[in-house]
Design a protein with these regions (language model features):
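Solvent-exposed, charged helical/coil patches
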Residues: 1-34, 83, 113-115
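Basic, amphipathic alpha-helical patches used to engage nucleic acids or provide basic targeting signals
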Residues: 11, 15, 21, 43-110
């Protein structure tokens, strides 16, 4: 097993509280029948949640993503994922904690289920 695979496995076993909240919405095809994978490797990156069918990645960001070096890294990462045909949606931990209904509505819109 390579380092990235081991890291992805570790992350799957240690979801953040916000990842657990969103995973409870997405797992077992509960969100409109779509299948999601968590802590999935794409290239040299591990994404929080992936819906292969729709080529949509959902990322949950903590406060560390506000720092300059992390903003640069996230921008590079998102450009790479976009170049591979993926749409990347980002939510802050605060969004999950304080506005899960709003997060759900954004997901509905993104997946074309808002009607």
């Amino acid at each position: 097993m390579n380092d990235l695979t081991a890291k992805a496995r570790e992350l799957r076993c240690n979801l953040t509280p916000q990842e657990k909240i969103l995973w409870n919405i997405l797992k077992n095809r509960q969100f409109y029948g779509y299948r999601f994978l968590r802590q999935y490797i794409i290239g040299n990156y591990i994404v929080d949640f992936l819906c292969k069918e729709k080529h949509i990645i959902i990322e949950i960001d903590g406060g560390q993503h506000n720092e300059e070096k992390d903003i640069v890294y996230d921008t590079k990462r998102t450009k790479y994922l976009n170049s591979k045909g993926y749409q990347v949606i980002r939510f802050w931990n605060n969004d999950i904690d304080n506005n899960i209904e709003g997060v759900y509505k954004i997901l509905q819109q993104t997946f074309g289920k808002d009607s």
